[in-house]
């Protein structure tokens, strides 16, 4: 068809008729788009909502038509005022595209969400929480997201009530700062919040610090020195973003709702939920284990509120009612947790306690004067006052352990099988209730430390709970004795594998007691408590680490027992944390406490840490006297495996005379020194016989002369600890 001809036809309808007349000759059918006349005024384009592909298929169909004439113009003429028959009324109504309902297509989840699943939402979450988790995971890119719902904590955390905490791991320090900055900007822009990012450096501040650090590094390099400052204030590895208080999701106790009308107090109740996002690097998150600490706190709080009996108002207890059965139900020991907030008695109980009888019978000031041993022999003991806090401990320290275990009877509920128990509970019945409770706890602690099979730690924990629920005092001496009982453990070398570590249940009980002592105001950042925990988490025998796969075939080397490498590393991590607590709190140890730590490090084969601790004693100003040096050499003389640190050990011999005051080589020191030299150098006897001229042989001669002088002084009845004064010919 000529393009000029089509160009001359300006009417759209006329042009369509011309095209149809030519196409009909080639047997191609054209279906009309809509009903109506062929007039120019009534012709309109197809609706936009129709599918283009379907219209295209209808317009250009290659199937031949039965009647070519009908296919050319199949639209019948319609007179004015008449409607076509057989068509429904709905087809006449035109629905615009913006009024049609869109079909919701299934959204494809983001690929990052499949790799890093979001934590489940808690009960009654605030509306912002889901979008916040989505933004942190997908847009910011934090990994290993976890969520802790702390809204039920009672008392609430220091960050505020109704708290939800989110934890996330950044890929690096730079990613950490960028993520925190973007999160704060997103919260300000999207939700008009005012977040506070603790630990986040501003962009200009970060540039300034990096520029200063580079300048210091350049100056140090030119001066041929290194930067020794461990913390530059940039790489903290931890940023805490306080989102603030958002709407919805608050937790309210039922009793609070009932008392809301008659609420009397100061301030206003804050409605809403507080959200905090903890962003850390992977190393920092593993180091501080903040998530584990909050999770333990949450578990303790949830277990506390489950069925713990509250103290009831009652008259003061009479002396004869002490041994009656208590009303506290026997529950699982993990549910028997107490805090200061749950043990406050009411007014009647406080009045009864404060005005209770405090008198003591003057004739009952003894704990019995005789004891019957397992062999039937009677031993007379000196009387001791029951009010003395060390009377029981002093009594059982003066007798052998097997006799003490016999005096303690069958167990906790045994009160009359031995003469000691009969007299003990008779005196307890006449004592005030608070003193009687303290004495029973003291007796159980001593029995557990002696590893009596009838006295168990859960029973001791229940007795402590009863003591606390009665609002009795807990002194520091009682707390330390209770802590010793919970941390005491007798290793079982006959089991397979050997049991060398304190069970987790016992450690959990000890931590609960420490937690309660802290709530009562006792100082927990103390050297005594820190050393007890350091020894409590350690192995109770000499060990050496091996791989888990090699453990069944690993023999016992000397006195050292093989243990899994991952277990040994876990113990060392806990010890390292306790050491950092000591350094941060500037806690000073005594010489006896250093000896306990040195023995633990030596038993687990941490020789580098052993010698570092030995040097720290001198830096801390602790006097390394003769007892410490005897302990040092005796420790090495009892075991082997330390031969790679022989130089450090032998260097301690000339160091003794440089101490303040000097430590001279006497007979006792010379004997243990010779044993250590023999272990380190088995050929020392041959060298001495050949009279070789080396420092080791001269040291052997010095020890021999000191031993001979001590023996001669002992034979003459003189002091055997007289120092050995060496001559130049001995060196």
From Swiss-Prot:
- Its predominant location is mitochondrion
Per UniProt, the keywords (alphabetical) are: Membrane, Mitochondrion, Mitochondrion inner membrane, Transit peptide
Q: Which Gene3D superfamilies match?
A: Beta Polymerase, domain 2
Q: Which GO terms describe its cellular component?
A: mitochondrial inner membrane
Q: Which InterPro entries match?
A: Atp25, NT_sf
- Region feature Disordered, mapped onto this chain: 61-93, 356-396
Q: Where in the cell is it found?
A: Mitochondrion inner membrane
| Any one GO biological process | mRNA stabilization
Q: Where is the transit peptide?
A: 1-52
**According to the UniProt entry, which residue ranges have a biased composition of type Polar residues?**
356-378
Bilayer topology term: Peripheral membrane protein
The function of this protein is: Probable mitochondrial mRNA stabilization factor.
Family affiliation = Belongs to the ATP25 family.
Stated name of the protein = ATPase synthesis protein 25, mitochondrial
Q: Tell me what gene encodes this.
A: ATP25
